[in-house]
Amino acid sequence: MQKNTPSRNTIRLTRRGRLALIVAGAVVAGTAVAVPLLTVEGSHRATAPATLVIPEGWRAAQVYDAVDKALHLAPGTTRRSLPQAGLKLPNDAGGNPEGYLFPATYPLDARTTPRSLLSAMVETADRRFNGAPVAAGARRTALNVYQAVTVASIVQAEAATKDDMGKVARVVFNRLARGMPLQMDSTLNYALNRSTLRTTEKDTRLDSPYNSYRRMGLPPTPIDNPGEEAMRAALDPPAGNWLYFVTVRPGDTRFTASLEEHERNVAEFNRNQQRGGPTAR
């Protein structure tokens, strides 16, 4: 860690977890894109819901659970189907579909299977992420496409609003360029399989490749399944020298290059929390 990076008990780069993952209202509205599915003839089950909505920022585990429920399957069925699913993932993914289960609205019928649903999600991601503009954007930021999806997943998890996404992406790139650890709570939340705004000193000592307080660079995989807005932010972030950000209160995320200013912002966040004000995201 660089000398200009504060100790964990002094500072928190971000105070936003993925509590919003479960709140589908506004998120779903931005992902209601109908995607046709492949189905398997001869597969029958009780009447399923007409569609399955996958919100932006859901983790793969959440997607698997949602598929099980939508198709009236025993818990864990979709996850167990992965080795036989034959998903067309990039080589860098190593068979892990995290980041490529594209958020959208998927139609269901009595013949829909976990394999057909997951395949549709991955194929949709492939169409969105593998065009020439995406490849060119990744090259501009000195990343390959899989790394760009990883950055987009962090942006999706950390940005309080779509307007913040570009700045969050710029913070990621600025810290990477300076050899600073990302110090993103969202990566720790992923490692610990949780969603929280609270990160302790003990959490930051976790021995995990997803602990961006201890490990340099990007996490080894995406940490959720980002949407197109987050991907655009990762490919073309605005210019800026920001290194820190914190959502002091809903709708008030402050970005700065100054450690002193950031510490003041974090202190204000803490005061708001102690007063029992609205949860910052």
Description of each model-found segment:
Residues 1-19, 27, 277:
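Terminal targeting segments of Actinobacterial cell-envelope proteins
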Residues 17-20, 25, 36-133:
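Signal peptide-directed extracytoplasmic domains
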Residues 27-33, 154:
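Hydrophobic core
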Residues 88-281:
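Bacterial extracytoplasmic/cell-wall-associated proteins, especially those involved in peptidoglycan
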